Amino acid sequence: MSHNTFGHLFRVTTWGESHGEALGCVIDGCPPGITFTLSDIQSYLNKRKPGQSKYTTQRRELDQVEILSGVIVQDDGITFVTTGTPISLLIRNMDQRSKDYSAIVHQYRPGHADYTYDVKYGIRDFRGGGRASARETAARVAAGAVARKIIPGVIVRGAVIAIGPHTINRNRWNWSEVDNNPFFTPDAEMVQVFSDYIDKVHKNGSSVGAVVEIVAENIPAGLGAPIYAKLDQDIASLLMSINAVKGVEIGDGFAAARLTGEENADEMRMGSDGKPLFLSNHAGGIVGGISSGQPIIARFAVKPTSSILIPRRSIDVDGNDVNVITKGRHDPCVGIRAVPVGEAMVACALADHYLRHRGQVGCFKR
């Protein structure tokens, strides 16, 4: 299988499978002199790791990251400094139960990558889905933690704004609520609504989808390039690469098609600090493929988990009609744990464009 690497200057290669011995990533192109600690990476992995609530898979993984190369430990024994050589990060798998998948060795799960992987490669890893599993995203989160260190002052954070048919009230948006509930939602009043809905669907043996919003702040104007190197193009590409993501929008996205020109235009005035002041942000912080200095806003849709207990019609590898039931431990709403993954992918795209801009232009205009 090819295509396990993304990025241009800040390049990340992920490796490993859901039920393999370990998974991880190699980061190439990280500048020397970047400092971080293990806890800087671990805090994001802890946000993504399974088994933290009944609304995620009950697979128990510590997701403790190990750094194998690319850094020097400082005298305090805690701080790492990058050397400019490839950074290798490893996360060991501890709680695989491959026997749970014995019934689908020769069956294709509807909505899963079983069939398409098999038809392309002539072989597939049925144990937890292999590379098609959400487990693969742990390595991305680790890479995203390093990426955050490259742009000075950058803040990248995400939240669940919809689960199934239920959507938050944006007037109640409070970032401080996101880490106080198992759904990473900024609307405290929706916690019980989400809980009741997922409980009902999961009790019936099914799963639900979600919409996640990512906001990046303190991004300098000028990142990205016209036509084939647009910043929003790369953000969309990386978000779409996340397993189970079926749609991405930047700024107002598809809603912009329902606006008039005067409604959609982000008007400008000169601020008291001598910098441009935007009166709105319909563009989501990116115009013409280049960052405007406003917050960058992206949303992505995560489909319901394909592995469910309700029988679904499918076929087996011999072409026979079958009814598939997937046992094992699966997320009733995988969109919840997609929040730190989306953050990581946006952070990696921003770090890559930051280095590309610095290499071509050399400095930033604020």
UniProtKB/Swiss-Prot annotation:
Enzyme Commission (EC) number: 4.2.3.5
Keyword tRNA-binding: no
Species lineage: Bacteria, Pseudomonadati, Pseudomonadota, Alphaproteobacteria, Hyphomicrobiales
Protein name in UniProt: Chorismate synthase
UniProt organism field: Bartonella henselae (strain ATCC 49882 / DSM 28221 / CCUG 30454 / Houston 1) (Rochalimaea henselae)
Primary gene name: aroC
Keywords assigned by UniProt, alphabetized: Amino-acid biosynthesis, Aromatic amino acid biosynthesis, FAD, Flavoprotein, FMN, Lyase, NADP
Gene Ontology MF terms in the entry: chorismate synthase activity; FMN binding
Pfam families: Chorismate_synt
GO cellular component, one term: cytosol
Cofactor note: Reduced FMN (FMNH(2)).
